[in-house]
């Protein structure tokens, strides 16, 4: 493990231990930090600069083995064929130092406290945030295989408070489209390669599915992933092309879960500490 990697892990472990000890977490419990205080907004739609045209942020979510990775690749080829600038991203990004720690955890090569690994997953998204915004502003559409919703669903499935799980994600860019590939956990378990990593167990996936239900809102597009690959692909293409067109016309960026609810305010500064990990 590199020095930078071990330093990040040490900080994450310290923060994770603090959060575990304080089951009722309040702002006055937090250690001092030089980060700029994060302002909570009552609306999640915040314009970032004057953008005439930009790329779309499209996120595919769902249980393990629901078909996300295959559909992401198909969407990439489709948009490239239409002449759009487009890239495929995946979270966790296992190429970074934080991502390598996550990869070791997922492959059962290491063990971390549940709160600690959640903060590392969030840090993995934060370390790509500035690049993500720059790519979108430059007109590149990003097809993203898993995002913050996965982090929240999987951690809350372990019994961690869902608002606590959402708090480190506050301030990340919100997707223009969330495409949820819906499949019963039992059906997903029948697909090849299931069970290779830490979370790929039927009972846990059932809990994850329940947590996804809590996260869904009217903006999500729910796709029946039990259909043929071709039928799923056809539906996704139509939705994504509409979003790409809207973003080229200057659709404003939004931020994730910006709110003024009591729980958001109570846990809101977690995002500052996640950024401090990097």
Model regions: which residues?
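NTP-dependent small-molecule kinase module
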Residues: 2-52, 76, 186-278
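ATP-dependent small-molecule kinase phosphotransfer cores
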Residues: 82-173, 235, 242
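Hydrophobic "anchor" residues on beta-strands that sit immediately upstream
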Residues: 57-60, 141, 172, 178
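Walker A (P-loop) phosphate-binding motif
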Residues: 50-76
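Structural signal for short hydrophobic segments within the conserved structured cores
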Residues: 87, 177, 221-223
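A glycine- and Lys/Arg-enriched "phosphate-lid" helix/loop adjacent to the NTP-binding pocket
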Residues: 146-211
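Catalytic metal- and UDP-sugar-binding loop of GT-A-like glycosyltransferases, i.e.
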Residues: 61, 181, 225
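Hydrophobic residues on the short alpha-helix immediately C-terminal to a glycine-rich phosphate/catalytic loop
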Residues: 75-78, 105
């Amino acid at each position: 493990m590199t020095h930078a990697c071990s330093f990040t892990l040490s900080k994450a472990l310290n923060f994770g231990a603090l959060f575990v000890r304080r089951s009722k977490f309040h702002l006055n419990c937090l250690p001092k930090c030089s980060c700029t205080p994060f302002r909570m907004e009552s609306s999640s739609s915040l314009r970032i600069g004057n953008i005439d045209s930009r790329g779309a942020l499209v996120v595919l979510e769902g249980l393990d083995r629901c078909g996300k990775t295959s559909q992401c690749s198909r969407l990439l080829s489709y948009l490239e064929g239409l002449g759009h600038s487009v890239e495929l991203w995946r979270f966790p990004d296992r190429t970074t130092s934080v991502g390598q720690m996550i990869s070791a955890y997922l492959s059962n090569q290491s063990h971390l406290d549940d709160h600690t690994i959640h903060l590392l997953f969030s840090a993995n998204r934060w370390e790509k945030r500035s690049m993500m915004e720059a790519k979108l502003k430059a007109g590149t559409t990003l097809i993203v295989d898993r995002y913050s919703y996965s982090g929240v669903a999987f951690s809350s499935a372990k019994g961690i408070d869902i608002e606590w799980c959402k708090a480190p994600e506050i301030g990340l860019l919100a997707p223009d489209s969330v495409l949820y590939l819906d499949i019963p956990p039992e059906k997903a378990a029948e697909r090849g390669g299931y069970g290779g990593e830490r979370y790929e167990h039927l009972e846990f996936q059932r809990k994850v599915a329940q947590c996804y239900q809590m996260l869904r809102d009217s903006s999500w597009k729910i796709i029946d992933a039990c259909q043929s690959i071709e039928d799923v692909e056809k539906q996704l293409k139509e939705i994504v092309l509409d979003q790409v067109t809207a973003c080229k016309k200057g659709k404003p960026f939004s931020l994730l879960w910006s709110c003024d609810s009591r729980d958001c305010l109570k846990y809101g500064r977690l995002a500052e500490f996640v950024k401090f990990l990097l």
